[in-house]
A protein has these predicted regions:
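N-terminal single-pass transmembrane signal-anchor helix
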Residues: 4-32
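Extracellular/periplasmic head regions of type IV pilus-like filament subunits
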Residues: 66-130, 134, 143-144
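Sequence-pattern detector for short linear motifs
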Residues: 8, 40-44, 51, 90, ...
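Aliphatic-rich helix starts adjacent to a transmembrane/signal segment
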Residues: 31-52, 61
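Alpha-helix exit/C-cap motif
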Residues: 52-73
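N-terminal cationic amphipathic segment used for targeting or macromolecule association
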Residues: 19-22, 28, 36, 88, ...
Length: 144
């Protein structure tokens, strides 16, 4: 008599499951590295939006003032540019901790009206933009 049983044996199924488990164990650590890199890139992109929005609002204010006027950025009512306005223009959901704007120095080096530093935090990642930073930390953006 012929035995016409079709299908896999229990041993074959267990072997396949073990192989899949080994492959998953090898891939999961690599994937978490890619996920972290993607999160870093996302916070850098949002920080760039904040820098561009900051520079836009600072330029608008600076253009209306006398040459060499200082621009202040903050949450106080005395600030020329409000952080809430920057956040609204940048369309970001994170927290803008600080925005610094350069001033004209007595040595002739001028960064007046240029956003020189931005600190932005979102989803546990903090990105710091520094003007003229050249140490290779993702351009002028350093994520921690």
């Amino acid at each position: 008599m012929k035995n016409n049983k079709k299908g896999f044996t229990l041993v074959e199924l267990i072997v396949v499951l073990v192989i899949l488990a080994i492959l998953a164990a090898l891939l999961i650590p690599a994937l978490t590295g890619y996920i972290d890199k993607a999160k870093n890139k996302a916070v850098v992109a949002e920080t760039r939006q904040v820098v561009m929005a900051s520079q836009t609002l600072v330029d608008e204010y600076y253009a209306k003032q006398a040459v060499g006027a200082e621009v202040t950025v903050g949450t106080e009512t005395t600030s020329n540019v409000k952080i809430d306005d920057i956040k609204k223009l940048a369309e970001v959901k994170g927290t803008i901790t600080s925005v610094e704007v350069g001033t004209t120095s007595t040595t002739g080096n001028t960064n007046a009206g240029i956003v020189t530093k931005v600190v932005y935090t979102n989803k546990g990642k903090t990105c710091t933009y520094t003007y003229e930073k050249t140490d290779g930390t993702d351009g002028a953006y350093d994520v921690k």
